Amino acid sequence: MSNYLEQVQSLTSSKTSNGVAWGGINPEYAARMRLQNRFLTGLDIARYTASIMRADMQNYDGDTSQYTQSLGCWHGFTAQQMLMAIKRHKHTTNRSYVYLSGWMVAALRSDFGPLPDQSMHEKTAVSGLIEEIYTFLKQADARELRHLFVELDETRAAGGDVDAVLDKIDNFQTHIVPIIADIDAGFGNEEATYLLAKKMIEAGACCIQIENQVSDAKQCGHQDGKVTVPHEDFLAKINAVRYAFIELGVDDGVIVARTDSLGAGLTQKIPVSQEPGDLASQYNAFLKTEPVTDATSLGEGDMVFKQNDELVKPHRLPNGLYAFRDGSGEDRVCLTVSPASKTARICFGLKPKSLISIRSQAW
């Protein structure tokens, strides 16, 4: 039996069992409303789209011609019209995503007006936009399904091929597609990152993109003056996002870990190393330093630390930031972690076309 007819039959039984209270209810109308509102919450959307994105990632790993396209949208209406146009042209929404960049949100969605891409816009601007986009996409579903319901009524009245119309309804493809949502650098520490990630997931995001810049000194990825955080800080924020996904029951949610290390020449702090080769030691190895052979050469407030059995002084700018060695950016893109005797080398995405997903199991 058609799924549509099963819904009608089920609601007809419910009407009978509810007696007078449902006396004015038309079971077929109710079935249509349910089909038009398939996704009741943002979490329903996040779980549904996460499974799509994971399948697409697996397909791409097996065949790189099966790539996806993520098109930027700054309003629910533009997303709606974009997906309706894609579906009309391609007869499918497969491998078509919506991309919400922090740059775009800062420029077009802040109550403060157009802003540079420096995390100065409201924290909830992205989660609000996610909810808005999915509201418009659900509206597109309701609109197209209504046309099919009208076609069904007209076909019945004319004695036409009802089964053909029922097949269209049963195989209707939703306009709900995955959204890749940019959380910038998390808008604060790992706790702030976790709280904001929850808001974004609850709004429907199955994929969150995060970068390794200092949150309160964040710059657009195409600008100079970028300041990165130590590896431990970035991994803590990635895990915070993973915890948010797990808590909300979106276990296969995707995290896009993006680095600005290639173009960033500064760090705000020097992490404390506990043993040679740990994450802090790896990070500090890229600092621009000079050997210290005589304590009298140190100035007021200078700091030194031990590196490879010698004392070195990191190069500190007048603003208190520390510089990395010239040409070390490409090496800083990757790091090695060794949790419980397992070693994993992680290379973070440099730019949109090379973004990779990082799962919490990797560390």
List where the protein language model places each region.
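Alpha/beta enzyme core
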Residues: 2-363
